[in-house]
Amino acid sequence: MKVGAEVRRRGNREDGRQVMARLKKTVVMVGMMGAGKTAVGSALARGLNVPFLDSDEEIERAANRTIAEIFARDGEPFFREKESQVLARLLRGSPCVLSTGGGAFMAEGNRRMIREQGVSVWLKADLDVLWHRVRHKATRPLLRTPNPRETLRALLEARDPVYAQADLAVESGEGTVEQMAVRVREALATRPDVLETDE
């Protein structure tokens, strides 16, 4: 696995002209809630001039309910089933940048689909960064517990070894959203089967 921050930056030719890039596979952003998958993925998609999709938004649109409402009414197993169905549909589409929910990559079937049809990018963040980003948000059903920070810590501990199976990893900590998107693009540039440039 290559960490994006360690990849040599690519963007402009020596003559100053912009390097053109063509996305050949869907880029699937994975990682914990609060890692920045939606913000960074959206910025990456703009830079690559491809669509940006959010699997949670697609699930909400299909169910006509919010994620929190789905969890409350139908439970997590039902949500995970719908999540896999939506993920399969989105992966069959044209190459894009796809943000997934924090638990999507936990299912082996989802990891297999992503591996076969796209490339996974893990936005890696530590507990303090994640907690700072999610502590004031009421839209995280898994954190509706007496001690949400401890719940987040336990989720991070359980999920990190699975996220580590992603094709690429990029640190999601310091820097702006745009800077993190550049790091992801640098990581993708190491995979010519995913990102083709005119260099």
Curated annotation (Swiss-Prot):
Family recorded in the similarity comment: Belongs to the shikimate kinase family.
UniProt-listed Enzyme Commission number(s): 2.7.1.71
One of the record's GO cellular component terms: cytosol
Keywords associated with the record: Amino-acid biosynthesis, Aromatic amino acid biosynthesis, ATP-binding, Cytoplasm, Kinase, Magnesium, Metal-binding, Nucleotide-binding, Transferase
Name of the molecule in the record: Shikimate kinase
Localisation: Cytoplasm
Pfam families hit by this protein: SKI
Cofactor: Mg(2+)
Subunit details: Monomer.
Family matches, as CDD domains: SK
Chain residues that bind substrate: 56, 80, 102, 159
Binding residues annotated for ATP, in chain numbering: 34-39, 140
SUPFAM superfamilies: P-loop containing nucleoside triphosphate hydrolases
Pathway membership, UniProt: Metabolic intermediate biosynthesis; chorismate biosynthesis; chorismate from D-erythrose 4-phosphate and phosphoenolpyruvate: step 5/7
GO MF term list: ATP binding; magnesium ion binding; shikimate kinase activity
Top-level taxon: Bacteria
Keyword Transcription appears in the UniProt entry: no
GO biological processes: amino acid biosynthetic process; aromatic amino acid family biosynthetic process; chorismate biosynthetic process
Cofactor binding summary note: Binds 1 Mg(2+) ion per subunit.
Catalytic activity as recorded in UniProt: shikimate + ATP = 3-phosphoshikimate + ADP + H(+)
Residues the record lists as binding Mg(2+): 38
Function field: Catalyzes the specific phosphorylation of the 3-hydroxyl group of shikimic acid using ATP as a cosubstrate.
